């Protein structure tokens, strides 16, 4: 039997398990939920991975199976159809609902995932940027990248220094914001709204295992996905003829398997490129989670740890 909402005090608890793909987050989340259950506390796992939100990517997103869930409630897994793009703001809105539901029933919400933007949006909120003028957006998107960069250097020098020269999408975004609103993107982002970080008692854990071990696991996982039907999953996606710019079509493994299905590359090339794409993604996530979260968030580099020690605050409610 879980606790009642009154038992939480002023700030109800939220557990957070984050880190790169293939780092073992899902397993730790379930272990934590079961450990809490032994202490008389219910828990629910809430997905914070931008690929696992899509119903079309059960295999390629490594969504936990029923056996892996071990009877623990899991929410926001496979909730979006691939024809829709799930933005960070949309995910955060749904996550807030699931967190509130869990707290209302006395359960501990356990956020688990590797999408830093999702987590940051949920905890810190989003900048209330007004809609961008359509004519301004169209004009900026039509600019060659070198002209867009030159304009950004003049109109938002800080953004120009911060963004990579080849990052056309973010360059255009920064430029359209300053031209449409008269304020820079960084200025807007200093006034975020809607975050829950100051309203909950956060119990975070960052999974940062040995990189060599992580990359080897990425390689094994991609091959396992193929054994579990990833090619059929991509074949079904291709048959839907979705917009190639949609997130579901840009998910790790989709492009590589699609190229193989179309006869553009052979199977060994597909496996090698899929594994490389997975490792590259894990590397970017690893770097982000090592440096971006607050320094006082625990970082774990080995699985040889006691949940009750890392999440001691959760077991004291």
Swiss-Prot record:
<dbReference type="GO" id="GO:0052381">
    <property type="term" value="F:tRNA dimethylallyltransferase activity"/>
</dbReference>
<keyword id="KW-0819">tRNA processing</keyword>
<dbReference type="GO" id="GO:0005524">
    <property type="term" value="F:ATP binding"/>
</dbReference>
<keyword id="KW-0547">Nucleotide-binding</keyword>
<comment type="similarity">
    <text>Belongs to the IPP transferase family.</text>
</comment>
<comment type="function">
    <text>Catalyzes the transfer of a dimethylallyl group onto the adenine at position 37 in tRNAs that read codons beginning with uridine, leading to the formation of N6-(dimethylallyl)adenosine (i(6)A).</text>
</comment>
<feature type="binding site">
    <location>
        <begin position="21"/>
        <end position="26"/>
    </location>
    <ligand>
        <name>substrate</name>
    </ligand>
</feature>
<keyword id="KW-0067">ATP-binding</keyword>
<keyword id="KW-0460">Magnesium</keyword>
<comment type="subunit">
    <text>Monomer.</text>
</comment>
<feature type="binding site">
    <location>
        <begin position="19"/>
        <end position="26"/>
    </location>
    <ligand>
        <name>ATP</name>
    </ligand>
</feature>
<dbReference type="InterPro" id="IPR027417">
    <property type="entry name" value="P-loop_NTPase"/>
</dbReference>
<feature type="region of interest" description="Interaction with substrate tRNA">
    <location>
        <begin position="49"/>
        <end position="52"/>
    </location>
</feature>
<keyword id="KW-0808">Transferase</keyword>
<dbReference type="Pfam" id="PF01715">
    <property type="entry name" value="IPPT"/>
</dbReference>
<feature type="site" description="Interaction with substrate tRNA">
    <location>
        <position position="137"/>
    </location>
</feature>
<dbReference type="InterPro" id="IPR018022">
    <property type="entry name" value="IPT"/>
</dbReference>
<protein>
    <recommendedName>
        <fullName>tRNA dimethylallyltransferase</fullName>
        <ecNumber>2.5.1.75</ecNumber>
    </recommendedName>
</protein>
<dbReference type="GO" id="GO:0006400">
    <property type="term" value="P:tRNA modification"/>
</dbReference>
<feature type="site" description="Interaction with substrate tRNA">
    <location>
        <position position="115"/>
    </location>
</feature>
<dbReference type="InterPro" id="IPR039657">
    <property type="entry name" value="Dimethylallyltransferase"/>
</dbReference>
